[in-house]
Design a protein with these regions (language model features):
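Double-stranded beta-helix
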Residues: 16-79
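Low-complexity, flexible helical/coil segments
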Residues: 6-9, 13-14, 42-52, 61-62, ...
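Non-heme Fe(II)/2-oxoglutarate
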Residues: 71-73, 77-135
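Short, conserved beta-strand element in jelly-roll/cupin
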Residues: 1-18, 65-68, 73, 97-102
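Short, surface-exposed, polar/charged, turn-prone segments marking secondary-structure boundaries
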Residues: 2-4, 35-40, 51-54, 93-94, ...
Length: 135
């Protein structure tokens, strides 16, 4: 994201550990600046199990096991990963990213993705009318 003042939150719905692929972080890696991926991220790429080679020392990474209901918050430039879940147990996370309204995705060729992020329903007609004017 640019500007680079975005934070990510991860809330664990299940206990996570090294065996089921908990998140790993490299402390201090946000000080290295934006890391170039060197390729375009496509939907096909996202659907496959992939690795990104960033020429970093992975031994600097630390696991962050979480109990169900626990959360972590980290800067968007902190390098992070998770390994495959090698157990039969779930490892469900809720990822939320908080950014400036004018921030754009660096990995999307600096093109903002536009659209509703969340939309509920209401029985109040005045709310429906107002939303029609917005969207």
């Amino acid at each position: 994201m640019d500007p680079y003042n975005t934070v990510t939150t991860i809330t664990s719905f299940d206990d996570s550990n090294i065996e089921n692929g908990c998140i790993w972080l490299i402390p201090g890696s946000h000080l290295w600046g934006q890391q170039e991926l060197g390729f375009r991220v496509t939907q096909k790429w996202k659907n496959e199990l992939n690795e990104i080679d960033l020429s970093v020392n992975e031994s600097d990474a630390i696991p962050i096991p979480l109990k169900a209901g626990e959360s972590i918050i980290f800067h968007c430039l902190v390098l992070h990963k998770s390994n495959p879940n090698r157990t039969k147990k779930y490892r469900r996370y809720l990822f939320l990213r908080y950014a400036d309204a004018d921030a754009v995705e660096v990995y999307n060729h600096r093109k903002p993705r536009l659209g509703k992020l969340l939309n509920g329903t209401t029985s109040y007609q005045e709310v429906n009318d107002f939303e029609k004017e917005l969207f």
